[in-house]
């Protein structure tokens, strides 16, 4: 069971960058998936979650700045990319109905987004 992020790159501040998390070995219809980021020199910051049902929940600071969606095998994170969004972005499988990082059981390696 694994997840892997993609889509990170050097970009200018512009709407429309989408990061993709591809999962294998488990079904997104059975698990909740979160997105987390880590800016250079800072700690982990939880962005939001998409539940197995397809509904979403976001950290208060992330509302309106990020959109999480999914297909049968991918979980996407779309961001409008202000410069402070430079970070490594991770997707993670979370315990059902939980929004706490302590309950993550599968992490991806992350994808780096540099906004310049």
From Swiss-Prot:
Keywords: Adaptive immunity, Immunity, Immunoglobulin, Pyrrolidone carboxylic acid. It comes from the Eukaryota. GO terms for cellular component: extracellular region; immunoglobulin complex. Residues 1-107 form the Ig-like domain. InterPro entries: Ig-like_dom, Ig-like_dom_sf, Ig-like_fold, Ig_V-set, IgHV. It holds the Pfam family V-set. The modification Pyrrolidone carboxylic acid is found at residue 1. The keyword NAD does not apply. The keyword DNA damage does not apply. GO terms for biological process: adaptive immune response. Gene3D superfamilies: Immunoglobulins. This gamma chain was obtained from antibody to type III pneumococci and was isolated from the serum of a single rabbit. This is Ig heavy chain V-A1 region BS-5. It comes from Oryctolagus cuniculus (Rabbit). The lineage of its organism: Eukaryota, Metazoa, Chordata, Craniata, Vertebrata.
């Amino acid at each position: 069971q694994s997840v892997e992020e993609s889509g990170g790159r050097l970009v200018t501040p512009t709407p429309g960058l989408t990061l993709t998390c591809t999962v294998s070995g488990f079904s997104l219809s059975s698990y909740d998936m979160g997105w987390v980021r880590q800016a250079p020199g800072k700690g982990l910051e939880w962005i939001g979650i998409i539940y197995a049902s397809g509904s979403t929940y976001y950290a208060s600071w992330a509302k309106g700045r990020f959109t999480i969606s999914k297909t049968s095998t991918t979980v996407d994170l779309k961001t409008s990319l202000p410069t402070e969004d430079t970070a490594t972005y991770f997707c993670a499988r979370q315990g059902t109905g939980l929004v706490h990082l302590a309950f993550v059981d599968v992490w991806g390696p992350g994808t780096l987004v540099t906004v310049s």
